[in-house]
Each structure stands twice: as C-alpha cells, then as structure tokens.
Amino acid sequence: MLKCIAAVGTVVWMTMFLFLYSQLSNNQSGGDSIRAWRQTKEAIDKLQEQNEDLKSILEKERQERNDQHKKIMEQSHQLPPNPENPSLPKPEPVKEIISKPSILGPVQQEVQKRMLDDRIREMFYLLHSQTIENSTKILLETQMISLMGLSAQLEKLEGSEEERFKQRTAITQRIFKSIEKLQNPKACSEAKTLVCNLDKECGFGCQLHHVTYCAITAFATQRMMVLKRDGSSWKYSSHGWTSVFKKLSKCSFDEAVGNTEAKPFAEPSPARVVSLGIVDSLITKPTFLPQAVPEQLLESLTSLHSHPPAFFVGTFISYLMRFNSATQEKLDKALKSIPLDKGPIVGLQIRRTDKVGTEAAFHALKEYMEWTEIWFKVEEKRQGKPLERRIFIASDDPTVVPEAKNDYPNYEVYGSTEIAKTAQLNNRYTDASLMGVITDIYILSKVNYLVCTFSSQVCRMGYELRQPSGADDGSKFHSLDDIYYFGGQQAHEVIVIEDHIAQNNKEIDLKVGDKVGIAGNHWNGYSKGTNRQTYKEGVFPSYKVVNDWRKFKFEALLD
C-alpha cells in the first residue's frame, strides 16, 4: 500500500506542477503575470503542505510496520536478548501476536485511504472549477481521472474487501434484529410506545424521513413505534401503509394504544404512550438525532464505511421500506428492465417541479451528464477496459428521458416517462404516483453510482437505502448542490487537521483541533462553515478538515 500511496503522491505533484506552469504560460501581460505568480505561489505553498502531510503519513506507516516487524522478530527469538535488562520476562510466542491484532492499525489505514481519496477528489474539484485554456484543462483532468482510477484500485489490491463486506453485513443484521425485538414486544398493551403520524404535510421522501425520525427516536428511547391508526389514513394511498409495505410491528395501533391517552413526547417521560411531533418543531434537539452513530459501532463503522451516519439511517429506512409481496413483484419486474448485469449504470435523479426556484436551483441535464461521464472515465481506469455508457433517469419531468436519448446518442438511456407524469403535482397523491416514486427510489438504490441533488429527499433516500447492502457506497455519488444531510439533524461538525491562514476576506483562519460547523461544500476545493472557536464564518480548503461524527449510546442495540 505504501508504494501505491507514493505513486499517487508523485502523480499529484506532476499534475499540479503542470497546472501551475500552464497558469504562468497563459498570462502574458504584466498585471496578469503578477497575479498569476501570486496565485502560483499560493498553490505551491498549499502543495508543499499536502506533500508534507503525505510524507508524514508514509513515515508513520513505515515506522509502525518496522516496529511490528521488530516485535515479531524479538518474539520469535531471532534477535538476541537485551544484555542491559536480562530480567525481562520471556516473550509470548509469535502466534499469540498474530492471533490478536490491534484494531488501531486497520482503522488508521482505512481512514488514511479515505483521506487520500477525499484529497484527490477535492483537487479534481479545484482543477475542474478553474478557467484555464481548454486543452490544458482537458490534459489536467485526464491525469486526475487516471489518478482517481489508480486510487480506486487500492481497495482491490489490498484483497480484504470480501471480509469487510461480511463485517458490514453483520452490523446491518445486528441493527435489524435490535429493531425487530423492540418492535415486537411480548405484551403489546404493556409496551412503552411512541405514536407517529404518517401524514406530515409534504411529499413522499419527506414523509418517509419523518417516519425514520420517529423510528430512530423510538429506538433511542427504547419504545415500540406504531403509526397512528396503523397508517390507514394516508394522503398517498386510500389503502394505507400496508398497501405497499409490510407491517412495522405485530402489534396494531389498537392493541398498543387502545384508549390510552398519548402524552406529548418528552425525554425522559414516565408515560407508557407518547406521541411525537415533527422534527421541525423541536427547540432543543436530542443528542440521538442524525447524524449520530451508535457509540458501540462507531469504531467499527469508521473503519468499514465511508459514511457511518448514512449507513445507520439507511438501515432504518431499509426496515421501514420492507415491501409486501405485491409491491416486491412489481419492483422485481421494473428492475429486470434495467440491464444491471451487463455493466455499470449511473442513476440520475432530476427534480424539476415543486422545489425548483424555492428550495433548489435549476440544473440542466448537461450538468448531470458531465459528472456521469467523469465517473465512467474513472471507472474505466479502475477496471482497465472500455465501458458501455448506460444511465437510469428518475425525474418528475417527463421531457428529461427523451431529451437524454436525443442529446446523448452514445448512452443507453433507461427511465419511465409514465412514472414522471405521475410525479406531476396534479397527479402526485395517488396510488400510481406512490408506486412510481417507490420504483424510482428502489432502482436508484441498485445502480453503481448516483448523480443528483441532495436537496432532493428522493435522491437522499436512494443514497441511504443503498448503504446497508454490504458494500461501502458512502462515496458513490455526486451531488450538484448540498452535501448529505438529514432534515432536522444535529449540527454537522468537522475537525481541523491542518492550519489555514485566510488569503482573503471570504476565507477564515483555522487551527488544528478547531471544530467547524459545516454549511456545505462548494465543489471547487472549498467548503463553507463557522469556526466554533473564533465564531467566524467563511470558506476554507475542504481537505484541511475531517468529519467529527457524533455518537450516542443506543441501549436498545443488541450485543
């Protein structure tokens, strides 16, 4: 792995120097040359900082391996005893060391590998956003794509993904079993219960995220969750929750609640039955809200998955969206129309109706396709062979699929204009629309990569639903706007790992160890946030921080 990281570092240096040279060469006037030189000097300084970090990582890992090798050699008696301390106890046999490896090493390796991937991506975003000569930009981006493909191969070369897949699957099953035990008590009428109202005034993705909030709250407070009147009164379907999903519990609403008056949720609460309002109305946010991760799983998930909070939320959504047999049959039929077995497919979720212009900006198909093509080029480098271009489009605009087929003839385009029609505002709250949005989310969770806007709840659901599958899909997306979030979540914070001195009045200073409340990634090498120590808000280089995942001890989690 050291050789691979060193090779990646070398390519990064070569690419950046080519970029710097091109910047100087393309600025001829005196004023432009001075500005270019200043920009170049700043870039060189940043590059030197990154190089020192890379050298530090390499040296640290090299030292750890040397220490481990020395210890093994000593334990196997291949090194003479220390004459200055002959009273040292007899060392344990080598097999004891090998059978009890420290968890710290693998965790550090996984974290460092992801840090490397993140830095490469952020550097690509920086290059991609530059206004430089087109031929130079193409050359630089081609080299960066090659670099990302090389980095993606590290996982395959290490040869341990199969074991990590099993471990992630085991964690999913552990959470599932814990939810099932809490949801199915021995005595329904005696169980502590949380009542959730399904009909929040919003769309399907928003409603399912509300039920997810209810489920996580119930799990954190060790209560069974039931839908009010079993979800029989649902704006999306006159047939209720069970028209598409399985029951959430063996206990019905009448069995669990009956004539008991549900008290407003509070924690702690002595009431057996409580009713939960919407997350938007909270004044004080409980510490168990997303993006909190179970304290008992944080170390394992940090090693095994690139986005532990999305994994945890996704497991709850997977439990909630357990389809009944009729729905599963329809989904299986829809999935068969998408040739997933023929090669990779990128899923595009394109929102065009109610939220555009209010919650989200309009994004043309060209923007989605630009990042789709970049992913295919990286994947070709990773696999070492050319790939057929295939996309699946989920949209509330029936004109998008024909537009893609017309404008991108080198792509095989899949998607339903009929489903898009049911997503129109005048058709939205119908059984056909419900089945359509479920189908889109389900297929989006099965594709190889997502390009969408995370301001869309449907997009985030497709991303969340794919996380507990066993694979590490935490970074297999590109959002055209927001970073991942859960509506009503606790503040998303990051920790500074490299000092930063503001270069202009838009940037903020950072010191190692500072906490920053993250507001978003600008996808140009910079993120925006508020330094919790200085209370200054502004932008900073994204690579200088890492996520500081929140943790909460979920007592309901089984051992």
Swiss-Prot record:
GO biological process assignments: fucosylation; N-glycan fucosylation; protein N-linked glycosylation
Protein family: Belongs to the glycosyltransferase 23 family.
GO MF term set: alpha-(1->6)-fucosyltransferase activity; fucosyltransferase activity; galactoside 6-L-fucosyltransferase activity; glycoprotein 6-alpha-L-fucosyltransferase activity; metal ion binding
The record's free-text note on cofactor binding: May also use Ca(2+). The enzyme has substantial activity without divalent cations.
Regions of this protein lying in the Lumenal compartment: 25-559
Native organism taxonomy: Eukaryota, Metazoa, Ecdysozoa, Nematoda, Chromadorea
UniProt keyword annotation of rRNA-binding present: no
Reported function: Catalyzes the addition of fucose in alpha 1-6 linkage to the first GlcNAc residue, next to the peptide chains in N-glycans. The addition is prevented if the GlcNAc residue is already fucosylated. Involved in susceptibility to the nematotoxic C.cinerea galectin Cgl2, likely by contributing to the synthesis of core alpha-1,6-fucosylated N-glycans to which Cgl2 binds.
Segments of skewed composition (Basic and acidic residues): 63-74
Cofactor(s) the protein needs: Mn(2+); Mg(2+)
Protein name: Alpha-(1,6)-fucosyltransferase
Positions of transmembrane segments: 5-24
Activity versus pH, per record: Optimum pH is 6-7.5.
Membrane disposition: Single-pass type II membrane protein
Gene: fut-8
Species per Swiss-Prot/TrEMBL record: Caenorhabditis elegans
Disulfide cysteine pairs (residue numbers): 188-251, 196-214, 202-206, 452-459
Region (Disordered): 63-90
Gene3D superfamilies: 3.40.50.11350, SH3 Domains (2.30.30.40)
A single GO cellular-component term on record: Golgi cisterna membrane
EC number: 2.4.1.68
Cytoplasmic-facing ranges: 1-4
Activity regulation description: Inhibited by Fe(3+), Ni(2+) and Cu(2+).
Catalytic activity: N(4)-{beta-D-GlcNAc-(1->2)-alpha-D-Man-(1->3)-[beta-D-GlcNAc-(1->2)-alpha-D-Man-(1->6)]-beta-D-Man-(1->4)-beta-D-GlcNAc-(1->4)-beta-D-GlcNAc}-L-asparaginyl-[protein] + GDP-beta-L-fucose = an N(4)-{beta-D-GlcNAc-(1->2)-alpha-D-Man-(1->3)-[beta-D-GlcNAc-(1->2)-alpha-D-Man-(1->6)]-beta-D-Man-(1->4)-beta-D-GlcNAc-(1->4)-[alpha-L-Fuc-(1->6)]-beta-D-GlcNAc}-L-asparaginyl-[protein] + GDP + H(+)
Location of the region described as Important for donor substrate binding in the Swiss-Prot/TrEMBL record: 351-352
